[in-house]
Amino acid sequence: TIRKDILYLLMLKKIADKIKNYSGRPPVDELRKAAVLIAITDSDEPELIYTLRSNKVGSHGGEVSFPGGMYEEEDESLEDTALRESQEETGLDRSKVDILGPIDTVVSRYNISVTPFIGIVPKDISLNNQSEEIESCFKVPLSFLLRDERHRNDEINRDGDIFFMPAYQYDSFIIWGLTAMTVSYTHLTLPTKFVV
């Protein structure tokens, strides 16, 4: 049998190859724009980096999210937005992020066009909540997300259109809403025959 750490290294390579050739849903021009970073650790058991937003903030307080935020005029691109905001929120050194590319843009309930970027970071990358908006940073094993063990499915009614949104529970954290939907879209870019 192939060692587990070798399997994960092969998976990271497959993810990199697939993302670089992936043509996702582009940003919506007429909406305000934001970007988030889906950072995957380059380790024997890859993990995704999340933030828990502080209850002190009005928008998304107490919610789990990927690091990221709104596009600003000084940003060179949405990729730059994702990297800038991630560094501001988590202290993550943007120079150590190997961006593979974007996946499908999603539209939030506030009508913001959010583009996620997948990037590989060193397994021992330093994280600390740099912003008052962030209560803590934590990691979730990619293997947990690939198993798709949903805590529940939420029924959402948006202007008469009904759709279901997944929610995941990892330890005491609930991953739901736009962040959970982004995890589901990430599945589209991952190797379909990889078993964890």
PLM feature spans:
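Conserved small/polar residues in nucleotide/adenosyl-binding loops
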Residues: 186-192
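N-terminal strand-loop-strand
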Residues: 26-66
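Entry/capping segment at the start of metal-dependent catalytic domains
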Residues: 10-28
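Short, Lys/Arg-enriched N-terminal segments with co-localized hydrophobic residues
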Residues: 1-10
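Unchanged
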Residues: 56, 70-171, 175
